Amino acid sequence: MIRTLAIGILSTFILACEKLPDPVVPDTPREENNEGKENNGNDNSGETDTTMPETIKITVSGKTLPVKIEDNEATKALVEALRTSSITYEAHDYGGFEKVGSLGLALPSSDTQITTQAGDVILYSGNQIVLFYGTNSWSYTRIGKMEYGTLDELKVFLKAGQGMITVTLSL
């Protein structure tokens, strides 16, 4: 008898719930009229962001390091190219102190005689990117500096002395 009563109450409850009206969804808020207001930089008008970033990214074997970039014509041209898409190229060891590879495009160069340090990202001959894990003195255009932990960690990241790597540059 109790079981029959419980089934009856449950059935009545289910039927009652089926007859409830759909929940009322409040109106979505109206967009504010921004006429005459200053643009705070948060609109999505579709305009391309042309501010110069402070860093780009270098990815090797699925691991990424930031590169603090210089403010020069080469980096401006590189960032402009990276706004379109990332750039992937092959780099190989050279001289026991660097990985070098052709970028696949020419960048403006402003070569000066410099002594590189581990972590430097350098433009060579206008179209090659050099990633240093040692030092060298030559006439280069500085792109930036990889932000890394220890020298040993940088060498592992770049697979120093282990031949060809695939490098991806991105924003």
Q: What do these predicted regions represent?
A:
Residues 35-51, 78, 111-113, 119-122, ...:
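Short linear motifs in intrinsically disordered
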Residues 86-171:
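Glycine-rich active-site loops that engage anionic ligands at enzyme catalytic sites
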Residues 8-13, 62, 66, 96, ...:
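Preference for short coil/turn "hinge" residues that link or interrupt alpha-helices
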Residues 54-96:
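N-terminal secretory signal peptides
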Residues 1-8:
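Sec-dependent signal peptide recognition
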Residues 42-61, 100-102:
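Short, charged N-terminal helix-start/capping segments
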Residues 8, 13-51:
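Bacterial Sec-dependent N-terminal signal peptides
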